[in-house]
């Protein structure tokens, strides 16, 4: 049988709704709405045709009611999500919506619709003059200017940022303070400045000239200019270990723990914290464990302190300013600063009296001694290397403070060249080779040199005899020539020997100058690489006595002519000069060794026969007697050196008082 019209089930259709309402009315004792008359006689006439037995109208009513409830719930949920987001940035009240209005369920659909809402009941709004932000940034105790920024909403409502909205109870019913339909009047909302760090950071970010504003606030807060403590780095990628940082708008809680947060990254820290109109201002002198660029430092501090990189001033400190060093020293021993780690040496040097006395006196002889010991003769190398010693050497620091650095540098280079030239002239060839061996580390092997000579079909005994006469400067044996095809290792072999013995290289390209032979005046051995036909013709015409090893006259620039015995000369060429009829007078003056085979390399491109300074040292030590290299016993000093130690300053007697 078909089911009768209507239904006897509970909680379904329209009967379910009225049944639940009836139970609530009978059992809970809720107050009856004002639109119903309690004294009226119930005749039942108002219930005629109240329930439509047609299923179409029941379904339509149920669908419309569900849609209205769903819409109201979605609007309320969206308002809560938007409220949380706006509360984070605007510090709004938890009871107010982001638009400053309270959402209500539209009661026009049914007088009882609000009572069966699935959401929790509305709480009463409380009067709060000052809201406490819990966004994580904390509040600052420093007074800040009150800023009210009002923006027209989409429906004409007022949206306030940078402050909280005061919820005021005017005695009306709940939910009547505002609505979401946008038809209410746009009333002025009073904003009370929360004086929180996030609002203060917004003020700083709104400033057009942030750099100038931060410098001005720093000077007002600390009483001195930030530029008095730092020097300027134009590039953000220049690395340095010491940095001075001024950080604005820091959370007070985070500022208190900054010392602990920064400790794993630094060797020394000097931290000061004061309040400014933008929050807590941190001034810190940091020495990192390794060199860092400004970008790296800013990114690290921004991560630790939750402050934008644009709210920081980061520059390296002044390392030679007594005023800056004294500021760090005096504030470091006071209770305004927190200091950890060893004090940087530049602060100690500028604040200790003895260092100040030592830095004020520059001794040129000490600089010359340093350049002589380090075998420096170029002025640029001297200036750079000596400036690097300023942190540890008081004389170098005094050199940097002097206004006559260029004069001192030129005098030092000149004196060093004179001493070096005189020392070399006083040594014979044996002493000079021994001196060069003393400057080279151990660990060489003489076998690659011998194997390379055998590879080029050169008898080792013959080569030793020629080298012996060559080093002694024997007449007619004063010139060695390595000839052969290209890529046979002639220049590689000759240049390695010249590098070991610190000889001079002359180039025929400068032969048009009168001074192209001037390097021969300050060397023990000379070399000319890749002599051509024109070069051999020049030697045959003008330099026969030089190849003989006899005294020659050499013109020098800005100096008079000098007469000296020509040092041994080593030449490489692709031409066999002894077999060419154009130079018959050179055959008796040169000793020629042919290199017929191409120089070998392994599969990695490295030379099979490695010839370097260590191998040449081992070679001369091995063939010392065969080359007839002897030293007199009195040439060595008390410490066993092959020559006396050169000292420009008298020894100091260090004895206690």
Curated annotation (Swiss-Prot):
Pfam families: PPV_E1_C, PPV_E1_DBD, PPV_E1_N. Residues 193-359 are annotated as: DNA-binding region. This is Replication protein E1. It is found in: Host nucleus. Residues 147-444 are annotated as: SMARCB1/INI1-binding. Residues 155-188, 633-657 are annotated as: Disordered. The keyword Zinc-finger does not apply. Its EC number is 5.6.2.4. ATP binds at residues 484-491. Residues 458-608 form the SF3 helicase domain. GO terms for cellular component: host cell cytoplasm; host cell nucleus. Phosphorylated. Sumoylated. ATP-dependent DNA 3'-5' helicase required for initiation of viral DNA replication. It forms a complex with the viral E2 protein. The E1-E2 complex binds to the replication origin which contains binding sites for both proteins. During the initial step, a dimer of E1 interacts with a dimer of protein E2 leading to a complex that binds the viral origin of replication with high specificity. Then, a second dimer of E1 displaces the E2 dimer in an ATP-dependent manner to form the E1 tetramer. Its main location: host cell. GO terms for biological process: DNA replication; viral genome replication. The gene is E1. The lineage of its organism: Viruses, Monodnaviria, Shotokuvirae, Cossaviricota, Papovaviricetes. Keywords: ATP-binding, DNA replication, DNA-binding, Early protein, Helicase, Host nucleus, Hydrolase, Isomerase, Isopeptide bond, Nucleotide-binding, Phosphoprotein, Ubl conjugation. Can form hexamers. Interacts with E2 protein; this interaction increases E1 DNA binding specificity. Interacts with host DNA polymerase subunit POLA2. Interacts with host single stranded DNA-binding protein RPA1. Interacts with host TOP1; this interaction stimulates the enzymatic activity of TOP1. Interacts with human SMARCB1/INI1 protein, stimulating viral replication. It catalyses: Couples ATP hydrolysis with the unwinding of duplex DNA by translocating in the 3'-5' direction; ATP + H2O = ADP + phosphate + H(+).
